[in-house]
């Protein structure tokens, strides 16, 4: 096998999950020579704005995909939730490895439970999806946008006017943070995850047969089925970071996939949700999207995308 160059964002989390995946490959073949190349993406440069206000899909992947096309790197290790549902021609998701916990972590000052936060308490999040779902269930709370890596957000919780913050549990787990800092993990009934949350997508060139063969050895078929249902739903709904959209699939009994899709208005007042079972992940994602469109969910998306 030739020397492999892995493209990664420069954040601590991106570099850590890239190294963890490389370790997985080296466990299969210790002779592999793999190097990480750090790449700065457009999304990394935007630190003072809410990402949903910036617009555009692929804020964290476009520059990395360009390096794949130019053969500067051989593969990219993405957080799957950052990867748009349409992969450019010539590139492919070569494998979907094991999924980390897909839920969100709620961290509060003095570990006050979410349901006990008082009127006007401020919850920090960088996600419209989280904000909308929290406002829907707890309309007396205030959502305030928060950006930055995990360390920055935890520091802001201590030093600024936030009463609590919500962030992806997978990032905390991969960075080795103790469960002790988390007040609680919010299950799907409280906060439906983002599309692909907790999963990685390993992107490479479609014609790189040697690498695709290697990646097949760390591919998790069940996780791939689940995220395919989720990403099909995202594509069918024309979802973007301007839209509060959630989706989560699991393997149920009889090897069926159970998938729940969710579209909300940013203020949490409108909610469209549907759960279905099926064996074909693409058909399942389409089915749930069609139900939500009939309910009127697409009107929200159209409005938000037009305002972009």
From Swiss-Prot:
GO terms for cellular component: cytoplasm. Its cofactor is dipyrromethane. GO terms for molecular function: hydroxymethylbilane synthase activity. Binds 1 dipyrromethane group covalently. Its EC number is 2.5.1.61. GO terms for biological process: protoporphyrinogen IX biosynthetic process. PROSITE patterns: PORPHOBILINOGEN_DEAM. The modification S-(dipyrrolylmethanemethyl)cysteine is found at residue 241. Monomer. This is Porphobilinogen deaminase. The lineage of its organism: Bacteria, Bacillati, Bacillota, Bacilli, Bacillales. The gene is hemC.
């Amino acid at each position: 096998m030739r020397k492999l160059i892995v493209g990664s964002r420069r954040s601590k989390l991106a570099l850590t999950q890239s190294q963890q995946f490389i370790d997985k490959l080296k466990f299969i073949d210790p002779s592999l020579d793999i190097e990480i190349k750090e790449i700065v993406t457009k999304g990394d440069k935007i630190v003072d704005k809410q990402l949903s206000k910036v617009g555009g899909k692929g804020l964290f992947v476009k520059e990395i995909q360009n390096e794949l096309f130019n053969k500067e790197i051989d593969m990219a290790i993405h957080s799957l939730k950052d990867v748009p549902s349409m992969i450019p021609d010539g590139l492919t998701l070569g494998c979907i490895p094991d999924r980390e916990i897909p839920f969100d972590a709620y961290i509060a000052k003095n570990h006050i439970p979410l349901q006990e936060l008082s009127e006007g308490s401020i919850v920090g999040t960088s996600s419209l999806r989280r904000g909308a779902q929290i406002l829907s269930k707890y309309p007396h709370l205030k959502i305030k946008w928060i950006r930055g890596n995990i360390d920055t957000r935890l520091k802001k919780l201590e030093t600024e006017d936030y009463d609590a913050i919500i962030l992806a549990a997978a990032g905390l787990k991969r960075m080795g943070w103790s469960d002790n800092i988390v007040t609680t993990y919010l299950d799907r009934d409280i906060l439906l995850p983002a599309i692909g949350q907790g999963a990685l997508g390993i992107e490479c060139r479609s014609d790189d047969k040697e690498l695709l063969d290697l990646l097949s050895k760390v591919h998790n078929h069940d996780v791939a089925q689940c995220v395919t249902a989720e990403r099909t739903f995202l594509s069918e709904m024309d979802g973007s970071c301007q839209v509060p959209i959630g989706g989560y699939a699991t393997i149920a009994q009889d090897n069926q996939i159970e998938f729940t899709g969710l579209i909300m208005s940013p203020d949490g007042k409108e909610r469209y949700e549907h759960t279905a079972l099926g064996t074909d992940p693409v058909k399942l994602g389409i089915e749930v999207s069609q139900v939500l469109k009939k309910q009127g969910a697409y009107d929200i998306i159209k409005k938000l995308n037009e305002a972009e």
